[in-house]
A protein has these predicted regions:
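Second-shell loop/turn segments in exported
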Residues: 2-10, 26-36, 88-92, 129-141, ...
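N-terminal capping segment at the start of a domain
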Residues: 3-40, 51-62, 66, 276-283
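Structural recognition of the beta-strand scaffold that forms the well-ordered cores
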Residues: 19-24, 63, 100-104, 113-117, ...
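Acidic/His- and Gly-rich active-site-bordering loop/insert found
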Residues: 23, 49, 91-127
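A non-catalytic alpha/beta surface segment that caps or lines the substrate-entry region
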Residues: 31-104
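Alpha-helical metal-binding/catalytic segments enriched in His/Glu/Asp
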Residues: 101-103, 116-122, 126-177, 300
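Metal-dependent peptidase/peptidase-like ectodomains
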Residues: 171-272
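His/Asp/Glu-rich mid-to-C-terminal helical/loop segments that flank catalytic regions of hydrolases
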Residues: 274-313
Length: 313
């Protein structure tokens, strides 16, 4: 068994249950961006990276940023773009302080990067609801965070130095308009040296109960190798996945992949489609398909291995 294959085996259902169980617990009250509950989630992520010896991207794991909205109304958009923020600061009614969490495993080529990411915020809680008031966000997106964490640990376990730097990114403010990933892309001094971005958003459920292995695999159409990789790995490693392959000419929508696609960076996005509990209190950890979450995470680990080590794609 190769180092890659042994590392893949460290990705387990038990680890997914532990990560999702904590992040989607009632104690975190839905991890709304800009709240102490979201900060607890960020501290948990940071503690995992530190425990595994994964260094921060910069001098610390947190990348702080602020977002501004013109009014207090819930539906008003938030802005992190420098030009927009400069115009809004004088008349803003609301400011949110948030931060991304960023870790990195250095590669041999210090001037090339790949990024694997997921947002850790959700939509909080509603004290006016009858019954369950907490939007736990197990699928959206504790499931995706668990995948990035397990992939980070698997690379450590591989004891292999990748060809390219691998950044493990946990975005804040996605539910308010991809704010964390937008800020990262706009301020990243090496953005033109990022060779690929892999995104997770909702990988633990699906809307096809008759086919629990169903998932959606979005990727930049010009990079046909991305589709080939998944097909080959499902067959080679017996992963119980039934992907709908979505080659996308301009993959700018849906999730944090859009922030990178707008810069022309090739993307892969794992997703298991919508369901009735989307942005509802019913998005609970007990409803996650942990076998599928594990197999998606293993498939994505193999993707990231290729992104970090294959010469061209």
């Amino acid at each position: 068994m190769t180092a890659k294959e042994m590392a893949m085996q460290t990705i387990t259902m038990d680890a997914a249950k532990a990560h999702i169980g904590f992040l989607a617990s009632d104690e975190l009250r839905g991890r709304k961006a800009g709240t102490n509950d979201s900060k607890v989630a960020a501290q948990y992520i940071k503690s995992q990276l530190r425990q595994w010896g994964i260094a921060p991207l910069a001098d610390k794991y947190e990348q702080p940023f602020s977002a501004y909205s013109m009014e207090w109304q819930k539906k008003k958009p938030y802005y992190v773009e420098p030009d927009s923020v400069a115009k809004l600061k004088g008349m803003t009614h609301r400011k949110l302080n948030m931060y991304n969490i960023l870790g990195m495993i250095p590669g041999k080529k210090t001037d090339e990067y790949v990024i694997v990411g997921a947002h850790f915020d959700h939509v909080g809680y509603d004290p006016d609801l009858d019954g369950d008031q907490i939007y736990n966000g197990a699928d959206d997106n504790a499931s995706g965070v668990s995948a990035v964490l397990q992939i980070a640990k698997a690379f450590v376990e591989s004891k292999t130095v990748p060809e390219r730097n691998i950044i493990f990114a946990f975005w804040d403010g996605e539910e308010l308009g991809l704010l964390g990933s937008k800020y990262f892309v706009q301020t990243c001094q090496f953005i033109d040296q990022v060779k690929g971005y892999l995104n997770f958003d909702m990988i633990g459920r699906n809307n096809k109960p008759e086919n629990p292995a169903y998932m959606v695999y979005f990727y930049t159409a010009a990079h046909t190798a991305f589709g080939d990789w998944l097909k080959e790995d499902i067959q080679r490693y017996g992963l119980n996945l039934d992907p709908s392959y979505r080659a996308w000419d301009n993959p700018v929508g849906g999730s944090d992949n859009g922030s990178f696609a707008k810069k022309g960076i090739p993307i892969i996005w794992y997703h298991t489609d919508g369901h009735p509990d989307y942005h509802q209190p019913g998005d609970e950890a007990c409803k996650i398909n942990y076998e599928k979450t594990r197999d998606i995470t293993r498939a994505a680990f193999l993707n990231v291995w290729n992104l970090a080590n294959v010469e061209s794609y």
